[in-house]
Amino acid sequence: MTTILKHLPVGQRIGIAFSGGLDTSAALLWMRQKGAVPYAYTANLGQPDEEDYDAIPRRAMEYGAENARLIDCRKQLVAEGIAAIQCGAFHNTTGGLTYFNTTPLGRAVSGTMLVAAMKEDGVNIWGDGSTYKGNDIERFYRYGLLTNAELQIYKPWLDTDFIDELGGRHEMSEFMIACGFDYKMSVEKAYSTDSNMLGATHEAKDLEYLNSSVKIVNPIMGVKFWDESVKIPAEEVTVRFEQGHPVALNGKTFSDDVEMMLEANRIGGRHGLGMSDQIENRIIEAKSRGIYEAPGMALLHIAYERLLTGIHNEDTIEQYHAHGRQLGRLLYQGRWFDSQALMLRDSLQRWVASQITGEVTLELRRGNDYSILNTVSENLTYKPERLTMEKGDSVFSPDDRIGQLTMRNLDITDTREKLFGYAKTGLLSSSAASGVPQVENLENKGQ
């Protein structure tokens, strides 16, 4: 069976991931007019820039959908977002600022839940608005086929007939108007935005040029913290975790994770927390650039890692970071539910997150400027009395430390012998000044 259909399958049911925007509206109407039977599926991911979700399926029916469904994906999205925080599943960082993989998390959820809904309706052909140069075309492909092994893919934006007729936004707008729909193009921004309740991605157009900075972006989840005219008073906030799960903000306990994430977004958003500028490597190995917002994810991540460093030992923390980066890359590639990702997730959630219980108090200021004011946990292995310089009872004595240092003589001797061995082979040069072979100064050799 052919997995990817290059031309419209006339007379067959096609499920389209319908956003209600110009692209998917024109595609749905065009498919109906050309003889296909389109079904519209809209994912409610809690997008901060979407005002009326209920209106989207109604518009789809007006444009010719055989049926239109709104699928509430918010609970699952937040669950996956919390799992990513527990695992540190983030691999793109610049100067200490993190991209929280919010778009890949959204695709993992919508890509599986929409196809599952289509399968319920007997729809086994799926289309969406992803382009052939991006990451989403592969993410949706993987998640779709994982959910429905019989799935076939039809994308209007890969169909030359569709492209020839409606290849641009102007043509699509004219097509909608000619068909009796007063569809005006939205005002063109200097960049494109994709969002869900975990975060927002701003990219393309002017942002493709590295001399266009974050200052051209109008945040949809936060504030322009770089604008000195924007008043942002400092704010204290407490975040509580129980066994790796965020349960309370500022003393308010949440039984609904969706409401908790919305409140975390509001708190972090007031300061522009979690906004970053990243150059990343797409799945196809080409580099792209994005400006990201994730105020709630950033707030939870900071508190989680503060507790992590106070509870776990060095080797566990090292494995958390190493495996988290590996898992973040798998998530980015659309492999969040692959076996290698599940193995890493299970290990990190079972042996790391389960011990993260406690409360962190922060002072948020502008952007990513914050201070940690207090850390409290019954599981802390940070115990100041162990290392206090004040006189009193100690868990070990000076003689104990002398013995420990003496034991180091073994590996120090081995290391010294290795260094002189490297010098004999020419990898290092002998140094009379230090007595230790060193890397030769290339400047002295005129190189």
Swiss-Prot record:
Compartments it resides in: Cytoplasm
EC number: 6.3.4.5
A GO MF term: ATP binding
Positions that bind ATP: A17, F18, S19, G20, G21, L22, D23, T24, S25, A43, G129, T131, D136, D194
Gene3D superfamilies for the chain: 1.10.287.400, Argininosuccinate synthetase, chain A, domain 2, HUPs
Residues annotated as binding L-aspartate: T131, N135, D136
UniProt xrefs under SUPFAM superfamilies: Adenine nucleotide alpha hydrolases-like (SSF52402), Argininosuccinate synthetase, C-terminal domain (SSF69864)
Main location: cytoplasm
Binding, L-citrulline: Y99, N135, R139, S192, T201, E203, E280
The protein's annotated pathway: Amino-acid biosynthesis; L-arginine biosynthesis; L-arginine from L-ornithine and carbamoyl phosphate: step 2/3
Cross-referenced PANTHER family: ARGININOSUCCINATE SYNTHASE (PTHR11587:SF2)
Name of the protein described by the UniProt record: Argininosuccinate synthase
Native source species: Escherichia coli O127:H6 (strain E2348/69 / EPEC)
Gene behind this protein: argG
